[in-house]
């Protein structure tokens, strides 16, 4: 199966995940741990792949990431210009 990409990326939120994570002063490992503490399975490797645009982000992961990063899910997917 061939993935459709936007500018060579497989997702639209990866860059904003990285920006929000760095603004929160979290490592990829710390972000993964924060999500895992809420009962969801997302590893440091998965966060890295999301940020690099190497994987698709399922719609159910967007609110998990947004909640852990304290940002609006619509901002993560580029539908709002401000984080909150």
Question: Predicted segment positions?
Answer:
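Short, basic-rich loop-to-helix N-cap that marks the start of a DNA-contacting helix
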Residues: 45, 52-67, 83
């Amino acid at each position: 199966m061939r993935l459709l990409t936007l500018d060579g990326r497989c997702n639209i939120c990866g860059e904003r995940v990285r920006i929000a994570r760095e603004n929160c002063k979290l490592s990829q490992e710390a972000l993964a741990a924060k999500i895992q503490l809420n009962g969801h399975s997302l590893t440091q490797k998965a966060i890295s792949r999301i940020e690099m645009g190497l994987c698709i982000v399922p719609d159910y992961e967007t609110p998990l990431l947004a909640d852990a990063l304290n940002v609006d899910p619509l901002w993560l997917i580029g539908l709002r210009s401000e984080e909150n």
